[in-house]
Amino acid sequence: MPVRAIKVIISMIGLDSHTTGAEVVATLLRDAGFEVVYLGTNQTPAMIVNAAIEEDADVIGVSLHASNFALVEDLMSLIEEHELTDVPVVCGGNIPPKQIEQLLARGVARVFPPGSSGDAIVEYFAGQARRT
């Protein structure tokens, strides 16, 4: 039986229009053999969760800035509500250290700040997939 590619949702939550980081991560993951569903900008928590359900995603990647912190809280609540806690959420972006701690405490699997290595990102996503 063939093994399917790890499927990843990549999104920017809220009104964040800084696409470079998310696009770089999407490209890194595609080049590494992942199946990437790129949702783009202006995504709500509900849109991200719906995409994860529809696409049967293994991992959710969210790009955000500190001002969108509350939306990640909403995202994590929806993930719990839809019983998707086996789908890891990985965040990246320009996030203050205190908010990184809060995101991790809320259930975000990992936060990658600017300057994180591409190899580390790919390796982490590969290790977090719930099924391959």
Question: What residues fall within each predicted segment?
Answer:
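Cofactor-cradling patches in redox/metallo enzymes
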Residues: 22-32, 36-123
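ATP-dependent carboxylate/acyl-activation modules
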Residues: 1-39, 50, 127-132
